[in-house]
Amino acid sequence: LPIVVPLLAPDRLGDYMRTIGIVPEKAERSELGVLPQHFADRFGWEELAAITARAWKSLTPEERERAIIVTSNYGEAGALVYHGRRLGLPPATSQHNNFYLWGPGKPEATIVVAVGISPDDLREVFEDVTPVASLTDRFAMPYEREHPVTIGRGPKIPLAEAWVQGKKFI
C-alpha cells in the first residue's frame, strides 16, 4: 500500500521499498531516483513557484510588462501555472512538448525569468544573465533535482526566433 498511496515520509518509503526488494520502475530515459517517478515528480513545485515569484517580483513594474516566465519542461510550466496563481505569477511558458504550441506568451518580451534552464544556455540568447536562486530537492528525479531560476535581459536574437530554435518534442 505505501507504494501506491503516499502513507510514509519520503525517507521511510525509500527504505521500505529497498527492504522489501522493490526498485522504482524506470519510466523515463534517465537514471532512477530514490522514489518511484509518480511520487518523485511531486516534490519541490511549491518551493519552485515561491523562488520564481521572488525573481518575478524583483523586476520593476516596467520590466514585468516586457517579461515572460519560460521553463525547461512542461512539468515545471504546469507546476508554475498551478502554484503561481496564488503568488501573482503570469502563466509560465515552455518550449517543451505541447506547451511549445501555445507560444511564448508575449512575442515582444525582452526579459525572461527562466526556470530550470542553465545560465550557460541563456547566455547564448541574452546579453545579461543574472542567477537568482536554485531549488535542490533530493527526492525529485535525478534530472529534476537542480532548478536554477535566472533572469535574462537584452536578447541577442528576437524572442520569436529563439522560441522556434528551442522547440523540444520528446
Residue ranges with predicted function:
Residues 70-74:
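An alpha-helix initiation/capping motif
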Residues 64-69, 110-112:
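Short active-site oxyanion
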Residues 81-126:
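Extended hydrophobic/aromatic segments used for targeting, binding, or gating
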Residues 1-65, 75, 82-88, 95-97, ...:
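Membrane-proximal, lumen/periplasm-facing interface regions of secretory-pathway glyco-
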